[in-house]
Amino acid sequence: MRKLERKFLSEDKTPALRNVVGFGMGSNSIDVALRWNTKEKQQEFRRQIYNSPAIRFEGKLDPIVDNREGVSTYQGISLKAEKPSYPLGTTEIRFTITNHSGEEFVYGDAYSITAQGTDGNWFVVPTDCSFTAIGHVLSDGQSGTITAHLFPDILPNKPGVYRFFYKDSIGGEKVPFMATFELK
């Protein structure tokens, strides 16, 4: 466990190490959470970082299908990508959230991204796995920014359409906001 901790805290952030989002001691295991959790990435972890029969990987195996949809505007709150398309190697994408609701609106930083697969289904893309619980206040008429991160060194970006999701409560109703962008 100490060896794993030293590697995780080191400055040498290889793609295999950047794929690790957390680890801890279970009752009889070392539990590891990966940003992109596939059999191949688990083997990469064992080869490059740490191999032990005590390792147990958490969560479902990727890719995880997520065909949900959302809205770009709801009761005066709107969400859109700063640009309609970005280069394939992009690691950061900005989204503008605008308030024309007639009252103050508070938004946070948590989000998720899906990409369209060759079969037409949408699958979850590895992004930031933890977010600071913060509230950004927008007065009526103001706009703010949510910055999303992609990790092409963990899962190479493919050309195509992507969906950015941000969920918030408005008037007691959970609203799934969605904005699309393209990588090419």
Model-based region annotation:
Residues P63-T132, V137-L138, K167-K184:
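Primarily secretory-pathway and cell-envelope proteins
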